[in-house]
Amino acid sequence: VAALAAYGNAAETMRQTRPECNLAWTTLAGIGHVETRHGRYRGASLNDDGYALPPIIGIQLDGSPGFARIPDTDGGELDGDPEFDRAVGPMQFIPESWRKYGVDANGDGRADPNQIDDAAVSAARLLCENGGDLSVAENWQRAVLAYNASREYVMDVRDSAAAYSVGTTAP
């Protein structure tokens, strides 16, 4: 429930601040589902304050088959890894993207990728900046590719978002 509320809030935030983006909450829900099952990856869950516990830290992005090679960009500050970057939180932000798009959306004075409200609005910012008008299919696809440069990922997000848009459970 916390994740869905965060996606709705993030879409509303974009409607007010970047109405030309036309971001649907279902796109964020699709990404949240594909990335971490809305903060429930590997036994994690969102607490009452919207934090993923235990924190969700992705695999080392060391260029292993199927994964990008991203040498460390933050001295391990965000992801705890001083050698390679790792995606962090329920929306799986890499440190470089978090530095660019991360915002405090829950009003606690701290932008934190492990907090679902912060992560959802930050994801919305990334999508809107990279896609423009997301009601245009090509722009939506470009935005999701900016989130994760994989055609399979785009299709998975599309399928999940479509399921949410008609009120069914994501695949």
Can you annotate each of these PLM segments?
Residues 1-171:
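Catalytic glycan-binding domains that act on GlcNAc-containing polysaccharides
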